[in-house]
């Protein structure tokens, strides 16, 4: 068996080549994180990891065309989601607002890093117009991290929610937010103006792995965001998601689930982490379906109103069905 743990990491880009305004992906993005990624032997994907390839179906192409026409982004494309073919083919998408350059460098994520562009004042109207044109009954709106904004982007979320409700009143709205770190109280106050139907913020992984997987984020802060929002809006469902396969233990995942319930989170998603490229964190385990089933059973025992748990589950995958299962729609 080949041991790749001693393989030197690729050389960092020369300082003179660094352009903070450019969108950095893969090696360019992860080269500057505090904990370097050390390659390990790539695990063979088991038979239960099956992804439907993106196709050239008319609905798939229609959605991509409309998105480009309105200068919109989806996390499905930017984060290289494995379910993009199925979701686009069924006419669903998770819209990513505030640009396609994130101020964070999370090494599990394939969204590009860089100095963000100014907010697009037309984006809320373009987003709402697109949702109305596609006749979507349920949408997920997420964003890159915008640590450059005083409100973390909360005001832009509110503008998008208002425009969607104006142009497509029957559409239910889930927002998947960044952590608003350093500006949480301000962000929550702003969100009071137009709360969503579902408030989602992902913990992503267990606290022991935060420094490696989520540099710039804080586990306790993310829990506080969810709890504080729920205290302000007890009738709005709260939701969070986790990845497995990064080196966490079963007991650690169960403890995170207990932490979420202790912070009044209603809905849960758990899915298998898949490495976007060799420059991202490696997959350390492909979790067996029996373990996913155990997590699902434990989630309902703990009191979650809905738990979507499985290898190919993602936070916004079949979000409409998740919300329906939780009694939201």
Swiss-Prot record:
Where does it reside? Answer: Cytoplasm
Tell me which PROSITE patterns the record gives.
RADICAL_SAM
The family database entries (CDD domains) matched by this protein are listed as: Radical_SAM
Which InterPro entries does this UniProt record tie to the protein?
Aldolase_TIM (IPR013785), Elp3/MiaA/NifB-like_rSAM (IPR006638), LIAS_N (IPR031691), Lipoyl_synth (IPR003698), rSAM (IPR007197)
Q: Please provide, alphabetically and separated by semicolons, the GO molecular function terms listed in this UniProt record.
A: 4 iron, 4 sulfur cluster binding; lipoate synthase activity; metal ion binding
Cofactor: binding comment: Binds 2 [4Fe-4S] clusters per subunit. One cluster is coordinated with 3 cysteines and an exchangeable S-adenosyl-L-methionine.
Q: Which residues bind [4Fe-4S] cluster 1?
A: 76, 81, 87, 316
Reported EC number(s) for this entry are 2.8.1.8
Recorded metabolic or biological pathway in which this protein acts: Protein modification; protein lipoylation via endogenous pathway; protein N(6)-(lipoyl)lysine from octanoyl-[acyl-carrier-protein]: step 2/2
- What cofactor(s) does the depicted protein rely on? [4Fe-4S] cluster
Domain annotation Radical SAM core: ranges: 87-305
Which reaction equation describes what this protein catalyses?
[[Fe-S] cluster scaffold protein carrying a second [4Fe-4S](2+) cluster] + N(6)-octanoyl-L-lysyl-[protein] + 2 oxidized [2Fe-2S]-[ferredoxin] + 2 S-adenosyl-L-methionine + 4 H(+) = [[Fe-S] cluster scaffold protein] + N(6)-[(R)-dihydrolipoyl]-L-lysyl-[protein] + 4 Fe(3+) + 2 hydrogen sulfide + 2 5'-deoxyadenosine + 2 L-methionine + 2 reduced [2Fe-2S]-[ferredoxin]
Give the region (Disordered) as residue ranges. 1-23
Q: Which UniProt keywords apply?
A: 4Fe-4S, Cytoplasm, Iron, Iron-sulfur, Metal-binding, S-adenosyl-L-methionine, Transferase
Q: Where does [4Fe-4S] cluster 2 bind?
A: 102, 106, 109
> What SUPFAM superfamilies would the database entry show?
Radical SAM enzymes (SSF102114)
Q: Which GO terms describe its cellular component?
A: cytoplasm
The Swiss-Prot or TrEMBL record describes its family as follows: Belongs to the radical SAM superfamily. Lipoyl synthase family.
Entry's PANTHER family?
Answer: LIPOYL SYNTHASE, LIPOYL SYNTHASE, MITOCHONDRIAL
Q: What is the official name of this protein in its record?
A: Lipoyl synthase
**Lineage, opening ranks:** Bacteria, Pseudomonadati, Pseudomonadota, Betaproteobacteria, Burkholderiales
